[in-house]
Design a protein with these regions (language model features):
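Bacterial Sec-dependent N-terminal signal peptides
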Residues: 1-22
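Noncatalytic scaffold domains of N-terminal-nucleophile
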Residues: 21-51, 63-64, 68-208
Length: 208
């Protein structure tokens, strides 16, 4: 009888696993319930950035005000995938005019970084690391373009949460710590970046 009991236990475990994943669907990947809000919501990859966006909305800021505040925080809290020195793309729906707006704030190549330069240096493809793959930052200019058209609160107030976290610190999440540590061998090749993103060449300690 023992093999039968064991088989039943396996069936129960599999059933429990399947049921725990479902959210009124038959899809095993649907593991989160829907979120419902009456006045607005924000979604980012970091809980603190999300809370900052919600706080901006509560203060009477627009969705763009909240998005800029959250984006500024992400540039600080997730340096492995976000930053003020990068690009910005936005799609904005204006409920008043019933119009859809798009913004391409991607950075251009530096003026003197021409095709002839690469040919003269014998560079056949843009390297993944170093100064050559870096474009002129478009993110901050994109913030002000969006704010000029859809913003309401002063930019100083919008950026203040990110400034406060930069001065006072913030908890480092496990996922960001993982990718941050993976990149240390690469950024250690550049002294100025090492000084900015490490503590004596090492990852900041995780504190929980």
């Amino acid at each position: 009888m023992k093999p039968i009991y064991f088989f039943i236990i396996l069936l129960l475990l599999q059933f429990t696993k399947t049921m725990s994943q479902n959210r009124l669907t038959s899809n095993p990947f649907a593991t989160r319930s829907e979120v419902i809000a009456q006045n607005g919501m924000a979604a980012t990859s970091h809980p603190l950035a999300t809370q900052v966006a919600i706080d901006i909305l509560k203060k009477g800021g627009t969705a763009i005000d909240a998005a800029i505040a959250a984006n500024a925080c992400l540039g600080l809290m997730e340096p492995t995938g976000c930053g003020m020195g990068g690009d910005l793309f936005a799609i904005v729906w204006d409920a008043k005019t019933q119009k859809l707006h798009g913004l391409n704030a991607s950075g251009r190549s530096p003026k003197s970084l021409t095709l002839d330069y690469f040919k003269e240096k014998g560079i056949e493809k843009i390297p993944a690391l170093g100064p050559l793959p870096v474009s002129v930052p478009g993110c901050v200019d994109g913030w002000f373009e969006l704010h000029g058209k859809f913003g309401k609160m002063p930019m100083k107030e919008i950026l203040q949460p990110a400034i406060d976290y930069a001065r006072n610190g913030f908890p480092l999440t496990e996922l960001i710590a993982y990718y941050w540590e993976r990149n240390i061998p690469y950024i250690s090749q550049y002294p100025n970046i090492t000084e900015t993103f490490t503590i004596e060449g090492k990852l900041p300690n995780l504190i929980f």
